[in-house]
Amino acid sequence: ARDAYIADDRNCVYTCALNPYCDSECKKNGADGSYCQWLGRFGNACWCKNLPDDVPIRKIPGEECR
């Protein structure tokens, strides 16, 4: 498991405004919790804590969001 920005199948972050949205999205993917990181590297995006290794994350630098 790792702490990371969760990503969809296009390598795009989950854009957020509030923590409860991120907490729901991250937990349903197996993470312990999360928060909405404002004005981060990818804008306002969900940061998951202890996200399972098989769940896609935003790669840094990685490919761009498609």
Curated annotation (Swiss-Prot):
One of its GO terms (molecular function) is toxin activity. Expressed by the venom gland. SUPFAM superfamilies: Scorpion toxin-like. Gene3D superfamilies: Knottin, scorpion toxin-like. It is found in: Secreted. Residues 2-66 form the LCN-type CS-alpha/beta domain. Transmembrane segments: none annotated. GO terms for biological process: defense response. The keyword Protein biosynthesis does not apply. One of its GO terms (cellular component) is extracellular region. The keyword Nucleus does not apply. It comes from the Eukaryota. Keywords: Disulfide bond, Ion channel impairing toxin, Neurotoxin, Secreted, Toxin, Voltage-gated sodium channel impairing toxin. It holds the Pfam family Toxin_3. Disulfide bonds join C12-C65, C16-C36, C22-C46, C26-C48. Alpha toxins bind voltage-independently at site-3 of sodium channels (Nav) and inhibit the inactivation of the activated channels, thereby blocking neuronal transmission. Has paralytic activity in mice. Belongs to the long (4 C-C) scorpion toxin superfamily. Sodium channel inhibitor family. Alpha subfamily. Has the structural arrangement of an alpha-helix connected to antiparallel beta-sheets by disulfide bonds (CS-alpha/beta). This is Toxin BeM14. It comes from Mesobuthus eupeus.
